[in-house]
Amino acid sequence: VEECALVLNPIVKEITLHFENRRDYTIIGWFICGLGAIFYSYEYLLRIAPSVMEHALREHFNLSATGFGLLSSIYYFAYVPMQLPVGVLLDRYGPRRLLTIACLICVVGTFMFTAATVFWIAAAGRFLVGFGSAFAFVGVLKLATIWLPENRLAMVSGMTSALGPIGAMLGDNFMEIFVERLGWIKTMNLTALFGVGLTFILWFGIHDKKGQHRQSGTVSSFKKGMIDLGIIIRSKQIWVNGMYGCLVYLPTTVFAELWGIPYLKHAHGLSAQAAGLANSLLFLGFIIGAPLMGYISDKLFRRKFPMLIGAAGAAIVMMMILYLPGLSESNIQSLMFLLGLLYSAQAIVFAVGRELSPGEAAGTAMAVTNMIVMLGAMFLQPLVGHLLDFSLSAHLGSAAVTGATIDNLQRLYTVDDYQFALSIIPLGILIAAILTFFLKETHAHAPK
């Protein structure tokens, strides 16, 4: 490690000085933000991994749908509350050291998860992964506020939001193949080894400073950061904005990240690979739509209008996916892609959160917004599993469900069971559309 540092540090410093002397930070800024975004994609891959290996995990740990939903959502029991200190810590200490340590924690958690033979050890591993992942998204946004132009904040947040689902697409399309050939344990161990290399890359590649000065987003006093946190978390507009983001993001946090592939396999009869492809098309739609929505919002100097249109359209498409009978595979793929395009308006909430808050608390504002956004996954992933089990028990009887094996349980779920459990998604998106009428229009300007 010391030898690598001796070789790499002078190179990185020379490149940085070259750009500093030219006062042209844009290229190196994109490079640094790109490294952070790779970590965000990596943690996203770890986040959605249980959906790809649902059958293997339920069999290995003997889990009901409720238990499987709980195992996945434990990630968020660390991720969500950590958003409160993450913003303050990033403002205080900078992204470089925190993103590096966070990536290492994700690696340790993944190895713990694969070594587990009982539920609570696996849950502890998922908790650690969630803890480390909590720094990724907001860390990239913090780097963007340091290195990239402020007048393109919505587009930058959209592009950042889009980069995470790239990890999900890799998981849906390639992890399934590795799981079938190597098993879930070896697959996750390989993923953890990649994280070891990424940890070193983050340490040597990321810089917290632009030129010789910290940006105004960096707070010198931890006490000041806590005061800012208190102001932000008491803001009604921050909560309205965050709840919009939470509800319109349910197609990702509840559907695509966990229950989408099982639903498409059981309700529409798709193969594992076809369901993975359809699921990845939702992420592809989001990847394309998030920066596009941000760009349109920046150009119009309006936040609420694209947020309203995106939510209303996403609710309609989600209902079509859930309730239209006889959809062909190509129909499902097209609808999933369209759904991703529409609900990508969610990415705008991070620009709004920044614009509703003072500049020196940029990291804190975006972290609080991200915390609220992720509340949906924390509570609704296990709720969908519970509703599935409840619906199954209602028409089969609890005794039959209790005595069934995991294999039999998965075959016993009906389309009605899934529709009942997943109905919370279109309902939530419709509520998000209504919330836009209570949100202040910032006109793409942060307070002075």
Kindly label every feature range from the protein language model.
Residues 62, 94, 115-121, 149, ...:
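Helix-breaking motifs and short loop linkers at transmembrane-helix boundaries and internal kinks
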Residues 104-117, 312-326:
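C-terminal ends and interior cores of transmembrane alpha-helices
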Residues 92-103, 298-312:
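Cytoplasmic membrane-interface "Motif A"-like loop-to-helix N-cap segments
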Residues 160-208:
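Helix-loop-helix hairpin linking two adjacent transmembrane segments in secondary transporters
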Residues 125-164:
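Cytoplasmic helix-loop-helix junction between adjacent transmembrane helices
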Residues 50-52, 235-291, 377-388:
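Extracytoplasmic gate region of multi-pass secondary transporters
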Residues 81-120:
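Conserved MFS/SLC helix-loop-helix module at the cytosolic interface between two early adjacent transmembrane helices
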Residues 18-25, 209-242:
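Juxtamembrane intracellular "pre-TM" segments in multi-pass secondary transporters
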